[in-house]
Amino acid sequence: MGMRMMFTVFLLVVLAITVVSFPLDRESDGANAEARTHDHEKHALDRNGCCRNPACESHRCG
């Protein structure tokens, strides 16, 4: 196997990895699944009517 053939195989492998990983990045939106919260969870109130999010401006307790 010559150097030119090895380089061509290397380029094909890099291209294949790029093509396969691109759709996976789009599905994850580039965000950590654990860090992602839904809008209804961000400003959800607990039993006492307090907002659980520290950045919440309304219904703050404590």
From Swiss-Prot:
Keyword Glycoprotein recorded: no
One Pfam family of this chain: Toxin_8
GO cellular component: extracellular region; host cell postsynaptic membrane
Alphabetical keyword list: Acetylcholine receptor inhibiting toxin, Amidation, Disulfide bond, Ion channel impairing toxin, Neurotoxin, Postsynaptic neurotoxin, Secreted, Signal, Toxin
Subcellular location: Secreted
Main location: secreted
Pro-sequence residue ranges: 22-48
Tissue: Expressed by the venom duct.
Sites of Cysteine amide modification: 61
Disulfide bonds listed in the record: 50-56, 51-61
Keyword Signal: yes
Secretion signal span: 1-21
Annotated InterPro entries: Conotoxin_a-typ
GO MF annotations, alphabetized: acetylcholine receptor inhibitor activity; ion channel regulator activity; toxin activity
Biological role: Alpha-conotoxins act on postsynaptic membranes, they bind to the nicotinic acetylcholine receptors (nAChR) and thus inhibit them.
Family membership noted in the UniProt record: Belongs to the conotoxin A superfamily.
Annotated domain remarks: The cysteine framework is I (CC-C-C). Alpha4/4 pattern.
Protein name, entry field: Alpha-conotoxin-like S1.1
